[in-house]
């Protein structure tokens, strides 16, 4: 796992308030990943990686791999 992936998992654990968040996490398998926490996740990612996300990009962040792919395309 690279440093960016580790940082994203750390942010997800904080935002969702769940310690056992793994690379398999998605909106479908994480009860805590609701609409408010989705926006909080986007905000934390913007701050951590010093970038600005478009609404379409935020909407597409439905699981760990999509978050990583989106970040890789922006960095």
Regions found by a protein language model. Name each.
Residues 37:
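Two-component histidine kinase catalytic core, primarily the HATPase_c
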Residues 14-32, 48-60:
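Phosphopantetheine carrier-protein modules
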């Amino acid at each position: 796992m690279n440093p960016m992936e580790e940082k994203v998992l750390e942010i997800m654990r904080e935002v969702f308030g769940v310690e056992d968040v793994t690379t398999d996490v998605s909106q479908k398998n994480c009860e805590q990943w609701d609409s408010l926490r989705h926006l909080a996740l986007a905000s934390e990612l913007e701050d951590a990686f010093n970038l600005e996300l478009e609404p379409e990009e935020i909407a597409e962040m439905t699981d760990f791999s999509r978050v990583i792919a989106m970040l890789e395309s922006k960095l």
